[in-house]
């Protein structure tokens, strides 16, 4: 047993190796979150705005508010 050589543990570069691994993981997670936000929130919102303004008439909306009496300066 005394003739067997024990393998020394790696003592240098442990922090650098862990940081590299965690930075890659954090980068991948941030890309995933950005993609989920874009396709889960931003694109549906953009589509909803486009659908609303496709048939929106400002004059018609103005006339409805005028008939409802929301403007004091217009009679």
Curated annotation (Swiss-Prot):
Pathway: Energy metabolism; oxidative phosphorylation. One of its GO terms (cellular component) is mitochondrial inner membrane. Residues 1-13 are mitochondrial matrix. The keyword Mitochondrion applies. Keywords: Membrane, Mitochondrion, Mitochondrion inner membrane, Transmembrane, Transmembrane helix. The keyword Transmembrane applies. It comes from the Eukaryota. It is found in: Mitochondrion inner membrane. Gene3D superfamilies: Mitochondrial cytochrome c oxidase subunit VIc/VIIs. It is a single-pass membrane protein. The chain crosses the membrane at residues 14-54. One of its GO terms (biological process) is oxidative phosphorylation. Residues 55-75 are mitochondrial intermembrane. Belongs to the cytochrome c oxidase subunit 6c family. Component of the cytochrome c oxidase, the last enzyme in the mitochondrial electron transport chain which drives oxidative phosphorylation. The respiratory chain contains 3 multisubunit complexes succinate dehydrogenase (complex II, CII), ubiquinol-cytochrome c oxidoreductase (cytochrome b-c1 complex, complex III, CIII) and cytochrome c oxidase (complex IV, CIV), that cooperate to transfer electrons derived from NADH and succinate to molecular oxygen, creating an electrochemical gradient over the inner membrane that drives transmembrane transport and the ATP synthase. Component of the cytochrome c oxidase (complex IV, CIV), a multisubunit enzyme composed of 14 subunits. The complex is composed of a catalytic core of 3 subunits MT-CO1, MT-CO2 and MT-CO3, encoded in the mitochondrial DNA, and 11 supernumerary subunits COX4I, COX5A, COX5B, COX6A, COX6B, COX6C, COX7A, COX7B, COX7C, COX8 and NDUFA4, which are encoded in the nuclear genome. This is Cytochrome c oxidase subunit 6C. The gene is COX6C.
